[in-house]
Amino acid sequence: MAGTYKIAVLPGDGIGPEVMLQAHKVLDAVEEKFGFTLERSEHDVGGIAIDNHGCPLPESTMKGCEESDAILFGSVGGPKWEHLAPNDQPERGALLPLRKHFQLFCNLRPAQIHSGLEGFSPLRADISERGFDIVVVRELTGGIYFGQPKGREGEGPQEKAYDTEIYHRYEIERIARIAFESAMLREKNVYSIDKANVLQSSILWREVVEEVAKDYPEVTLNHMYIDNATMQLIKDPSQFDVMLCSNIFGDIISDECAMITGSMGMLPSASLNQEKFGMYEPAGGSAPDIAGKNIANPVAQILSAALMLRYSLDEEKAARAIEQAVSQALEAGELTADLAGKGAALSTSEMGDKIAAYIRQA
């Protein structure tokens, strides 16, 4: 029997509403094709919520998210709200409380070069033409960003500042399991990134990851130091499948992966908790300079919806159908203005229509 799922849709600001509209078109297409039902409720978040409710994350929005199986998030922020105190601004006042409230400890950042877009990569042609398809699995709530104690003290030559890198066994185990589960859906390779030659936290990280790996005999586990990993991504990114990283290493690696694709407007992102409840959003920003012009690239938002189907709703076939439709459109040279160069560019809405049509035709 086909499932029914509740989705909280938070379009937000800038290009958020117009790219979210394209995600709706694509979700309509997979609903029809695969027979499940997505009950979608829309809520204000970010700047529009400040304008309408006086705060970036209204109680009604939080309640809508709590009653849902997943959150499909657009983008927030813009010059209109930059005068506000940092904690009242759309980004910090909406995204951080959502991550904290739902205990979203895992960040997933896919990065790939789509066929036909190799020329946008800053990598040498002979490297980019090999292609790559990577998912960075980043631990999001532990490590040096949150460890205590941290601070500054003293003065003069003796003044010092310090941070603490702390990881508990349970934090490493739960993020490792998501990496191995992800690998089972892909090429069955996990690269665990650490600095176990100098850091005690990385030694524990490596030990726990090796223990978890025993539960996934079909998956090949590789360990790699962070400094080598950053170099290998430039030399031959095609060797990687799933990259498992601590918070700070994942911060670095996921941005490097994004940059070597050469098309930031195409990259989705997911943040998950222990129950696989997730928030799914484009990796880019709200792009207020092009908002309302029907020229934004909706692919990142559409691929975020595919991640939602895969990780929170367990609708793998529908997720793949969306990803294949995106690839078909790009391979056919159907591109929005950010990628079309001097060629004919599709509008935001035309791109959404094309991808939905490919799903229905498949």
Swiss-Prot record:
Its cofactor is Mg(2+); Mn(2+). Substrate binds at residues 99, 109, 138, 227. One of its GO terms (biological process) is L-leucine biosynthetic process. Binds 1 Mg(2+) or Mn(2+) ion per subunit. InterPro entries: IsoCit/isopropylmalate_DH_CS (IPR019818), IsoPropMal-DH-like_dom (IPR024084), Isopropylmalate_DH (IPR004429). The keyword Magnesium applies. It is an enzyme of class 1 (oxidoreductase). It catalyses: (2R,3S)-3-isopropylmalate + NAD(+) = 4-methyl-2-oxopentanoate + CO2 + NADH. It is found in: Cytoplasm. Pfam families: Iso_dh. Signal peptide: none annotated. Its EC number is 1.1.1.85. GO terms for cellular component: cytosol. Mg(2+) binds at residues 227, 251, 255. Pathway: Amino-acid biosynthesis; L-leucine biosynthesis; L-leucine from 3-methyl-2-oxobutanoate: step 3/4. NAD(+) binds at residues 78-91, 285-297. Keywords: Amino-acid biosynthesis, Branched-chain amino acid biosynthesis, Cytoplasm, Leucine biosynthesis, Magnesium, Manganese, Metal-binding, NAD, Oxidoreductase. The record marks 145, 195 as: Important for catalysis. GO terms for molecular function: 3-isopropylmalate dehydrogenase activity; magnesium ion binding; NAD binding. Catalyzes the oxidation of 3-carboxy-2-hydroxy-4-methylpentanoate (3-isopropylmalate) to 3-carboxy-4-methyl-2-oxopentanoate. The product decarboxylates to 4-methyl-2 oxopentanoate. Homodimer. Belongs to the isocitrate and isopropylmalate dehydrogenases family. LeuB type 1 subfamily. This is 3-isopropylmalate dehydrogenase. It comes from Photobacterium profundum (strain SS9).
